Curated annotation (Swiss-Prot):
Belongs to the eukaryotic release factor 1 family. Pelota subfamily. Monomer. It comes from the Archaea. This is Protein pelota homolog. GO terms for molecular function: endonuclease activity; metal ion binding.
Length: 342
């Protein structure tokens, strides 16, 4: 997702963001960023009547015009890779008429609304999840590792590391190989895919967790049948690039929900369901609020979120398309990790 803020948001968060979705994932994010009452501006084809056009019987040519639609409903349609925004035209030709914007990847829009902290956090996540040129793939097998940077035109090899006794071998043990590869990965700021057959990749991730846990947190394992560049091609072909941001987010969501159920089992500092969470917020005990995305637009929960943010609580929205989100739905769609028991 590309995002541009033409002017600073007002104190209450109201303002306009220019947005360019680049993938089906971005369209999914937009479906949660566009709510009823928001105004969405886009260029679309409309029949524009001139003063004498209505007297003509021939078919008029459609022209590109910029219109604003006050949203009544936003619907994500993954089957056709598009987002539909239904509403009434509030700016441009045919004001007052109903219109549907069909938004696809590469289609620039502007969204005018009051942006809450959870909206800005989702927008930041969508922008940062762009994988072009930032994902690195390490193809590991027994005795060798190759590191690739994913460019828009394809994988670019950075280095090849080998273990052995021959002249081409630079390292004398698996541990030395792991250490050298980790040294290269210290310079990487984005997500890292560890690909290859067998269990060497799992061993490397375990090694990284002990030596550099902050780097290991950004790693994603991809099983492949091939080695080297073939492993990179196979991982990309299996859709690893589109899964990177989701899987890293999923890991965080899994961790949060595991903690919720752990505290429930221990009768610990946790609340779930609207009533309990509202009480926790009122007492100032809520540290982290977890909300299922399908509940965010619920009026009661929306007010709870605003109250929690005013008190400095961290608000995390979980996708109901993933297992942690469905577990949260089973608890009433909202839960809170507390600073202390109430």
């Amino acid at each position: 997702m590309k995002a541009e803020l033409p002017e600073p948001l007002k104190k209450d968060g109201f303002g306009e963001y220019k947005l360019m979705p680049e993938s089906i994932d971005d369209l999914w994010h937009l479906s949660h960023l566009i709510s009823p009452g928001n105004t969405v501006y886009a260029v679309t084809l409309r029949t524009v009547d001139g003063p004498s056009d209505k007297l003509r019987s021939e078919k008029l040519e459609k022209r590109p015009v910029r219109i604003g639609v006050k949203c009544e409903k936003a619907e994500f349609v993954p089957e056709s890779s598009r987002l539909r925004v239904f509403g009434v035209i509030s700016y441009g030709p045919d004001m007052g008429q109903h219109h549907t914007l069909n938004i696809e990847a590469g289609y620039e829009i502007s969204v005018v609304r009051q942006w809450r902290q959870i909206d800005l956090a989702r927008l930041e996540r969508a922008v940062s999840s762009s994988v072009h040129g930032v994902v690195h793939i390490a193809a590991i097998e027994d005795g060798e590792a190759e590191l690739y940077r994913v460019r828009q035109y394809g994988p670019e090899r950075i280095t090849t590391l080998t273990v052995g006794s021959g002249k081409t071998a630079e390292l004398d043990s698996r541990q030395a190989l792991f250490a050298e590869l980790l040294t290269f990965l210290e310079k990487v700021t984005g997500s890292i895919v560890i690909a290859g057959p067998g269990f060497v990749k799992e061993d490397f991730v375990k090694f990284a967790k002990t030596k550099a846990p902050e780097i290991a947190e950004r790693m994603l394992i991809a099983d492949t049948r091939r080695c080297g560049y073939g492993a990179v091609q196979e991982a990309i072909g299996n859709g690893v690039l589109t899964r990177v941001a989701e899987d890293l987010q999923l890991a965080k969501e899994v961790s949060f929900m595991d903690e919720v159920f752990l505290r429930i089992g221990q009768n610990g500092a946790v609340a779930y369901g609207k009533s309990e969470v509202r009480q926790a917020i009122d007492y100032g005990a809520a540290e982290t609020i977890l909300v299922a995305d399908s509940f965010v637009k619920d009026g009661g929960i929306e007010k709870m979120i605003e109250g929690a943010e005013r008190l400095g609580a961290n608000v995390v929205v979980l996708s109901t398309e993933f297992e942690p989100g469905t577990r949260l739905v089973g608890l009433g769609g909202v839960a809170a990790l507390l600073r202390y028991k109430i």
